[in-house]
Structures are given as C-alpha cells and as structure tokens.
UniProtKB/Swiss-Prot annotation:
Top-rank lineage group of the source organism: Bacteria
Source organism per UniProt: Lachnospira eligens (strain ATCC 27750 / DSM 3376 / VPI C15-48 / C15-B4) (Eubacterium eligens)
Gene: rpmC
GO BP terms in the entry: translation
Annotated protein name in UniProt: Large ribosomal subunit protein uL29
One Pfam family here: Ribosomal_L29
Length: 66
C-alpha cells in the first residue's frame, strides 16, 4: 500500500510541483548511476526504485494534461 499512497500524493500536487519532483528524481538517478559506476553504491535496488518513481510521476503528469 506504500506505492498507492505515493501515487495519491502525486495526484494531489500541481503540475509545477510534479515537474519539480521529476527534475529532482532525475538528478537523483544521475547521481545513483554515477555512484554505481564508481562502485560507491551499496543499495543498487535504489536505481530501479527511482526509475519507477520517475515513470509514476510522468504518468500522473500525462493524466493531468489529458
């Protein structure tokens, strides 16, 4: 149910807030990939989690624009 709560929180946000969150998530993904390439990342599953969150944010943005 944790994911459903996250999606509901996303749906409650405005388009500007969603765009800010999307930019922040993409920056985090970039940093995680960089850490993974330099063997500094312990929790590699975080990359997958952030990628899915980016997709969730983009989906909510598309739903709001439709």
């Amino acid at each position: 149910m944790k994911i459903n709560k996250y999606v509901e929180d996303l749906k409650a946000k405005s388009a500007a807030e969603l765009n800010e969150e999307l930019v922040a998530a993409k920056k985090e993904l970039f940093n995680l990939r960089f850490q993974n390439a330099t063997n500094q990342l312990d929790n590699t599953s975080r990359i997958k989690e952030v990628r899915k969150n980016i997709a969730r944010i983009q989906t909510v943005i598309a739903q709001k624009n439709a």
